[in-house]
Swiss-Prot record:
UniProt organism field: Candida albicans (strain SC5314 / ATCC MYA-2876) (Yeast)
Presence of keyword Cytoplasm: yes
Family in the record: Belongs to the eukaryotic ribosomal protein eL18 family.
GO biological process terms, semicolon-separated: translation
Subunit structure as annotated in this protein's UniProt entry: Component of the large ribosomal subunit. Mature ribosomes consist of a small (40S) and a large (60S) subunit. The 40S subunit contains about 32 different proteins and 1 molecule of RNA (18S). The 60S subunit contains 45 different proteins and 3 molecules of RNA (25S, 5.8S and 5S).
Predominant localisation class: cytoplasm
Compartments where located: Cytoplasm
Keywords: Cytoplasm, Ribonucleoprotein, Ribosomal protein
Stored Pfam families: Ribosomal_L18
A cellular component annotation (GO) from this entry: cytosolic large ribosomal subunit
Function: Component of the ribosome, a large ribonucleoprotein complex responsible for the synthesis of proteins in the cell. The small ribosomal subunit (SSU) binds messenger RNAs (mRNAs) and translates the encoded message by selecting cognate aminoacyl-transfer RNA (tRNA) molecules. The large subunit (LSU) contains the ribosomal catalytic site termed the peptidyl transferase center (PTC), which catalyzes the formation of peptide bonds, thereby polymerizing the amino acids delivered by tRNAs into a polypeptide chain.
Lineage: Eukaryota, Fungi, Dikarya, Ascomycota, Saccharomycotina
Any one GO molecular-function label of the UniProt entry: structural constituent of ribosome
UniProt KW Amino-acid biosynthesis keyword: no
Protein name, entry field: Large ribosomal subunit protein eL18
Length: 186
């Protein structure tokens, strides 16, 4: 007798197993961290490897002001900051502490600021030589939901989400449901 196939057969995993990018430098980092993730028992390397697989949208840039805030945490001043993404400058920040920062890439302004304050800007492969198990490190991630597009996601009543509109003016999207004087306001 045949067997009922009640569950779906070839269920595709929603997780990436490699980066989508063809960047050879990224592929070298993946090769390095997949080796470290396999051969060491440290979860740090697994986290870095998974982060290297992410799309650019899910690897938002981290500003130096966010890093300086992270360094103010208790016991974080001597740690190496790890960013799987870009480190960007923030000219609103007046002083920046001396720190060692490992990242995929740095903008010119951010690198200048780090080096000017006596810090170090290193790459992730240099970090692997210094801390193969991620000892004395602190991973910092950027804000994923700060993109303009996220303002429109999950549209519905009382969500306070922005409608997708072609024109932004006094007469557009401002009638019933948007003003007390026009029936009601959500």
């Amino acid at each position: 007798m045949g067997r009922d196939h009640t569950s779906k057969q070839h269920v595709r995993s929603g997780h990436r197993t490699a980066p989508k990018s063809d960047n050879v430098y990224l592929q070298l980092l993946v090769k390095l961290y997949s080796f470290l993730a396999r051969r060491t028992d440290a979860p740090f390397n697994k986290v870095i490897l998974k982060s290297l697989f992410l799309s650019k949208i899910n690897r938002p840039p981290v500003s130096v002001s966010r890093i300086s805030r992270a360094l103010k945490q208790k016991g974080a001043a001597e740690k190496t900051i790890v960013v799987v993404g870009t480190v960007t400058d923030d000219n609103r920040l007046l002083e920046f502490p001396k720190a060692t920062i490992a990242a995929l890439r740095f903008t010119a302004g951010a690198k200048d600021r780090i080096l000017k304050n006596g810090g170090e800007a290193i790459t992730l492969d240099q970090l692997a030589l210094r801390a193969p198990k991620g000892q004395n490190t602190l991973i910092v991630r950027g804000p994923r939901n700060s993109r303009e597009a996220v303002r429109h996601f999950g549209f519905g009543p009382h969500k306070g989400k922005a409608p997708r509109i072609l024109s932004k003016g006094r007469k557009f999207e401002r009638a019933r449901g948007r003003r007390r004087s026009r029936g009601f306001k959500v």
